[in-house]
Structures are given as structure tokens and as C-alpha cells.
């Protein structure tokens, strides 16, 4: 994923909270284990690409296989995403986007290196 619970979704770690994910069912927090048997072969734990071992968003069940390049839409996540974000481990700040009623997204603010540098 190109997101991080630690950097972009702090409430996921602090509450803890498993955000709704469009097209998937959120499972009980940390329900998946190596021995988990499920009625679906499409269960997975979604996490970040930081080095933080606990940077886990949640366990989810999909009705189809997810693949690299698929768009995953976490819902109900604007709570603290803009005011408590950070750039831990070099993770970029999240873009600000608006989703139109037809499902198309438009990025209205992208943060780059200068934004990172100005926060130091």
C-alpha cells in the first residue's frame, strides 16, 4: 500500500480503529493468524511499507483477489488524516483529494519535497 497507519491514519493505531474499506469486510482486529481458516481465500492483513512493525491498518476479507495496482478506498478516514500526519521513515504526506459522486477522484493538493523540508 502507498499509505501508512502511523503516518496517515494515526487513529487506526491510537484508538485502535479498523477503517471501513470499500468492497471489503473488516475482520475483528488481528483476527488472522497462520492457522486461520476462512470461507474465503481472499483474506489479508493490510499494512504499510514503513519499518514500524505495528504499522498495520487491519484485517479484511474480499470477495475477489486483490492485485498490485488496485485502488483500495478507506472510508471515514478524514478524521485526523490532515492534522496529525507525519513523514516518518520518509513516507510522503498524503495528497488531498475529492471523490466525486460518480466515483472519480481529483487530487486538489499534492505535497512534495519542499513541503517536507519546510516542516523540519
Task: Indicate where each model-derived feature is located.
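Charged (often Lys/Glu-rich) extended helix/loop segments that serve as interaction or gating elements
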Residues: 1-120
